[in-house]
Amino acid sequence: MLDKKARIRTSREYRNVFEKGKRLSGRFLIIYYVENALDNNRFGFITNKKIGMAVIRNRIKRQLRAIVREYQGQVKNKHDIVLVARAGIGKSSFEGMEKDYIAIMKKAGLFARNANKID
């Protein structure tokens, strides 16, 4: 689980990311991101009912949290990042989600330059 300080928690914080941030989309994910005034990154996760039943939505969120945790140290600091799952994500594999996350984060320039080689 992500630390409390590493999570976007209130609707005001989510709204700030959506209104002031930039958006990039991939096959399975849409990422909204904006700089924050903190010394760390914060992440939020959204899965809507188009994805499927609650069991599937919760599984997707757990998998996305695991991906974020794995690459958290390689992301540039001082950003609020919201991951929105797209409708086709329920049929994808964990590896497919991970590749999509890496591709979008690279495109956004959110990985630190000194990050380990990311495939």
UniProtKB/Swiss-Prot annotation:
GO cellular component: ribonuclease P complex
Protein EC: 3.1.26.5
PANTHER family documented for this protein: RIBONUCLEASE P PROTEIN COMPONENT
TM ranges: none
GO biological process: tRNA 5'-leader removal
PROSITE patterns: RIBONUCLEASE_P (PS00648)
Pfam family, one: Ribonuclease_P
Protein name: Ribonuclease P protein component
UniProt keyword list: Endonuclease, Hydrolase, Nuclease, RNA-binding, tRNA processing
SUPFAM superfamilies attached to this UniProt entry: Ribosomal protein S5 domain 2-like
